[in-house]
Amino acid sequence: MNSTEEIDLYNRWKALERQLEMLDLQEGFIKEDCKSLKRELIRAQEEVKRIQSVPLVIGQFLEAIDQNTAIVGSTTGSNYVVRILSTLDRELLKPSASVALQRHSNALVDILPPEADSSISMLRPDERPDVSYADVGGLDVQKQEVREAVELPLTQGDLYRQIGIDPPRGVLLYGPPGTGKTMLVKAVANSTAANFIRVVGSEFVQKYLGEGPRMVRDVFRMARENAPAIIFIDEIDAIATKRFDAQTGADREVQRILIELLTQMDGFDQGANVKVIMATNRADTLDPALLRPGRLDRKIEFPSYRDRRQRRLVFQTITAKMLLSPEVDLDTFIMRPDASSGAQIAAIMQDAGLLAVRKSRGVILQSDIEEAYARAVKPTDMEQFAFYK
């Protein structure tokens, strides 16, 4: 190797050495930058946690203005233009979504899951009523109609498609108090594998504007997400009376709830496996738009007056687990037309059992039932039932 080649190799070695020193220096700078960025990341995460720390204000996302600002509604009824936390996923910000607002600046700092502020819940399998169809005395026609309208479409929907007809979308149970409407629905909940959602009409009437319609949307959304499902709305007349020219804000809000209910019943398709059952004591006060075919296709009446056969079945069902004296003649009470409703007959036998307990007897005597009958059945009872006709 000549001297020229040695000089070239030496120069190349020196250049690589300088380059290595430069890389070592850059590595040190990068490590320092990484440490600084990690400290900034930790500070930013702590700041986000501080901003998202409870208590927060619950609001409703209304509309996005741009990527950084949006319009939200608060529980007080006011609307605000607020900033959106940069770490939030904009794809999850849908209209009517529940959001959390920072309590001082009202900045949108979190997106709540749909169920977070919903007061609607489904009955778990272990929470289902232990009432079966056998526990409902009489009402053979009503049982058959409910099964055809609710159970059969959920369990054997192919039969309806084979024939070429749509199954009933909703069912209305109407009749005086104590005639077995709610008890029959409990039997439906117990006998089907479908998810069961129960609400009372008055629960939709909330303090703040817009809360009632939002709850209606939550009920139907939950039912669609957990299909097959049954929605039972008891005392539907609380929100579905005939519309009129409302003069107060409360009346207008109730009418908005009804409109949302009508919209939701029109909105879900027949294949969603969602059935709606409504119950009321005053079917004559309901809005005609709710009663039209396509919403409540089946209307099942629960009569206040029961014939002897129906009363016999009710007495037999109620007394099946009771210890009656051999002298008890139930036909004596079955022949009397006064005790008409199942709840009234159940109250008579319950009171008779309490009389036997009071006298420290292990069996119920005829005299106990007679005394309980005299207490429970008043001459004005039949006149009270006339109010619901």
Swiss-Prot record:
Keyword Ribonucleoprotein: no
Main location class: cytoplasm
GO BP annotations, alphabetical order: proteasome-mediated ubiquitin-dependent protein catabolic process
Keywords: ATP-binding, Cytoplasm, Nucleotide-binding, Nucleus, Proteasome
Role according to the record: The 26S proteasome is involved in the ATP-dependent degradation of ubiquitinated proteins. The regulatory (or ATPase) complex confers ATP dependency and substrate specificity to the 26S complex.
Family named by the database record: Belongs to the AAA ATPase family.
Name recorded for this polypeptide: 26S proteasome regulatory subunit 6B homolog
Native species: Schizosaccharomyces pombe (strain 972 / ATCC 24843) (Fission yeast)
Organism taxonomic ancestry: Eukaryota, Fungi, Dikarya, Ascomycota, Taphrinomycotina
